[in-house]
């Protein structure tokens, strides 16, 4: 609807320019927002106030001329001037109802992408291997997956890339420890303890550390024995990761893994190609690119080091190789990096080097979707009581157990198997939603009690809202798509719910553009609240007549399908009853 209003305003502006009311050459960004007070309309624009000065007119006078120049449209019932010159647009409820009927008849809920579809690479999760995933990996994994789901739903071709840390000095350390203490498969499967023991030896023994560094060199040189052991470690790590992904209900698979090691053979080429473009400068033996716009505190250019003096490569080198691969091989139009926002400078520099070196094709978008940290109740990064990192799988186990206790208290008569199934959905969804509902750039404090509450903007509240809708149809013994007739919007609660349902497409396009799943969370929470008001004030099963009942059933059905689709895009499992 906002796009329709923008188009109407643009047509009015063009007409006023033709008539000489407005000067030529104006290219304003036409803003259309949801009206705060629905008695004053559904949407508002400040376009008259924006253009009053160049037009040499008072805002309200220009607003009158804009209204006179607006083309008629069946979706708009009237336009009024408010305050200093706002244009307030009222939706035509009959046209709105027809749009909802069309959405209900469409398997895709009439959702369409704003603009052309693209090939989008989503870089997400990317844990360092040789250790189990910890809570710090949660945000990249689920935010990236949620955005990837939305992009796919809108029609983009999405290529997930799990840029795991599967190369580096930690593997030399593990290989050295394995030589000292040959381990069984069971011992190796406990990666966390094996890694901890190896790290302790590395820190305590210089001889061990030197041997570990030597094994890294052998590994990088392609030594068959080292490569075989490295592959074993990598496979064990990836199996742990896959177990976690499946618990989290994210769509990452082994086929999406494209780790650091995948680019090893191209790193020398990256350096040589940078040299050929004239971008490389040697500084203290290292190969660097200096970008004038990135400077140190003492105002000297900040280097992007791509090869150390000893010949080793860095993260920047691997990232440049990955960018080139994503451009030349994957043919990406857009690449989204879901990585901690503390890496913002790194990505700004790497993206700029890639552009100057010609590693990206014209029009290719490189976007760092940075995120904040998950903190404990003390506001510091989330840790165990003894100060260690919290395994992600342990966090999910605790979430399920807490959810089980909560659900069993509320439903002691439910069979054990069903209780466990409900607890799994509620517990995992609660952890994910507590994260996804926050702006990704924000830090947040992890709190089990808040996230498992059935009140407020939480997963349990939304899952329960969906079961209320499902319950209506369960009582009737009919599926969502069984209602007939047409939607008629008479009561205020019907109109408010309908207006929000019609904004699903806009919401998803917003998420896709900005990489912000919290926008979808806020929409679903709002929708659930509006359905609750509708349910309480507009009897469905006790409607006044069959036509009214069918209309309200259709509104309920579209609400249920929209809630289910939205939760599914976030990677949350819905339940038919709780």
Curated annotation (Swiss-Prot):
InterPro entries reported for this sequence: aa-tRNA-synth_I_CS, Arg-tRNA-ligase, Arg-tRNA-synth_N, Arg-tRNA-synth_N_sf, ArgRS_core, DALR_anticod-bd, Rossmann-like_a/b/a_fold, tRNAsynth_Ia_anticodon-bd
GO cellular component term, pick one: cytoplasm
Reactions mediated catalytically: tRNA(Arg) + L-arginine + ATP = L-arginyl-tRNA(Arg) + AMP + diphosphate
Segments carrying motif 'HIGH' region: 127-137
Domain of life, per lineage: Bacteria
Keywords: Aminoacyl-tRNA synthetase, ATP-binding, Cytoplasm, Ligase, Nucleotide-binding, Protein biosynthesis
Compartments it resides in: Cytoplasm
GO MF terms held by the record: arginine-tRNA ligase activity; ATP binding
EC number: 6.1.1.19
GO biological process, one term: arginyl-tRNA aminoacylation
Quaternary organization: Monomer.
Record-linked HAMAP family: Arg_tRNA_synth
Assigned protein family: Belongs to the class-I aminoacyl-tRNA synthetase family.
PANTHER family: ARGININE--TRNA LIGASE, CYTOPLASMIC, ARGINYL-TRNA SYNTHETASE
Record's protein name: Arginine--tRNA ligase
